[in-house]
A protein has these predicted regions:
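A short, highly charged nucleic-acid-interacting micro-segment common to nuclease
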Residues: 2-13, 122, 126
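Active-site recognition of the HExxH zinc-binding catalytic motif
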Residues: 90-103
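Active-site scaffold of zinc-dependent metalloenzymes
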Residues: 43-86, 103
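Post-HEXXH active-site segment of zinc metalloproteases
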Residues: 83-86, 102-142
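Zn2+-dependent metallopeptidase catalytic core
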Residues: 8-29
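Propeptide-to-catalytic entry region of secreted or membrane-anchored zinc metalloproteases
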Residues: 1-3, 28-42
Length: 150
């Protein structure tokens, strides 16, 4: 598969998203995939991807920023300048891995315990998801870490 910084069409995005859903063994999830040209507003700033889900019903929505030249460091004051370039395919993999992680320790099962995780533990989980997404990205596209640099 060729690396994709920005999807050319919604049709291309939907096809690839469904293919990756299948390859990650997430076929039992009902997922609505969407693209946006605007950074996604989250608490405390903006993001290039967002997943909302209900583990019990296995349903989710995944929204991906489809903008090649977005530099989140310019949009979010609390972020330092970044050397990583936005990549829609990487963002899609990252968001799908949020659902995959739910098979390991579902948030619904953690219940209130999820709130007891320290901010550092939450960041560590998210950092590891990003590392896994980058690893998968490089494996399926045949790229190396240089691809992510601006």
């Amino acid at each position: 598969m060729k690396p994709i910084r920005e999807f050319k069409s919604d049709e291309e995005f939907q096809k690839i998203a469904k293919d990756l859903q299948h390859k990650l063994f997430l076929d039992d999830w009902f997922i609505i995939f969407g693209l946006t040209d605007e950074p996604i507003r989250i608490s405390g700033g903006y993001s290039s991807g967002l997943t909302t889900f209900d583990y019990g019903n296995r349903e989710a929505t995944i929204l991906i920023l489809n903008k090649d030249n977005w530099d989140y460091s310019a949009d979010v004051a609390e972020y330092k300048p970044t050397v990583i370039k936005n990549c829609a395919l990487l963002n899609l993999l990252h968001e799908l891995l949020h659902l995959k992680r739910e098979y390991i320790v579902p948030s619904d099962i953690l219940g209130d315990g999820a709130d007891e995780l320290s901010e550092m533990e939450k960041k560590d989980v998210h950092t590891n998801l990003e590392k896994m997404a980058k690893t998968l990205f490089m494996m399926i596209t045949g790229t190396n870490t240089d691809y992510f640099l601006k």
